[in-house]
């Protein structure tokens, strides 16, 4: 927030370095987001590089049994959808599946807690769409609540979209991310 060095590329190096030995401490959850072109250092109202959805995805990607909110409490009151979504992401996991990853470039991971699955993707400064086959799911059908980059996230990094869809075990979905973006989902079995 006070350096250009803490950016989406950096975020995609940490799972391969600091997290190799186990959980790590980090401060995701920034509400003030900027593209590389719009970023400036602001000590009064800190800004993070990358999209709001990138920040949401970090809660699933980074393993930390004591997660935190990195921003001012006032900012979470102004962003209730974001605050509500990240508050539902657990801090411990029963299972983890690495779907795809390339250090410093992109990553998609699935984690399980109880009966729910949590899916997240991160990208560097390149927009990308990654096809993910949901063959790791156990139940037949799931409600998938998605927090993803909005259509304008490539120029306004705080733009996001939420949606709910029904998916089935074995379906293929596209994890589409803006430059510096992210994608996160909570999958709850339908019984």
Regions picked out by a protein language model, each given a short descriptive name:
Residues 1-73, 99:
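Glycan-recognition surfaces
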Residues 103-142, 183-184:
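Carbohydrate-binding surface patches
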Residues 71-118, 154-158:
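Glycan-recognition and catalytic regions of carbohydrate-active enzymes
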Residues 31, 66-67, 115-116, 124-126, ...:
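Short, glycine-/Ser/Thr-/acidic-enriched flexible segments
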Residues 146-170:
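Solvent-exposed beta-strand/loop surfaces of large extracellular or lumenal domains
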Residues 76-82, 125-126, 135-152:
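Active/binding-pocket-proximal capping segment
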Residues 164-191:
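C-terminal beta-strand-rich structural cap/linker in extracellular carbohydrate-active enzymes
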Residues 72-73, 121-123, 134, 146-148, ...:
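Active-site proximal loops enriched in glycine and acidic residues that flank catalytic Cys/His/Asp
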């Amino acid at each position: 927030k006070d350096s250009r060095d803490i950016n989406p590329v950096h975020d995609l190096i940490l799972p391969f370095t600091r997290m190799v030995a186990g959980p790590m401490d980090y401060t995701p959850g920034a509400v003030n987001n900027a593209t590389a072109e719009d970023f400036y250092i602001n000590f009064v109202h800190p800004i993070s590089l990358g999209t709001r959805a990138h920040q949401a995805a970090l809660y699933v990607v980074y393993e930390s049994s004591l997660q935190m909110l990195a921003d001012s409490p006032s900012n979470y009151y102004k962003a209730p959808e974001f605050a509500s979504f990240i508050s539902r992401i657990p801090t411990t996991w029963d299972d983890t599946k690495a779907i795809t990853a390339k250090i410093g470039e992109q990553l998609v991971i699935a984690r399980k807690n109880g009966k729910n699955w949590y899916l997240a993707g991160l990208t560097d400064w390149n927009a990308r769409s990654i096809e993910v086959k949901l063959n790791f799911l156990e139940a037949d059908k799931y409600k998938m609540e998605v927090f993803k980059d909005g259509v304008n996230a490539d120029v306004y990094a705080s733009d996001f979209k939420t949606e709910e869809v029904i998916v089935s075990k074995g379906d293929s979905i596209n994890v589409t991310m803006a430059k510096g973006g992210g994608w996160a989902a909570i999958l709850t079995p339908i019984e």
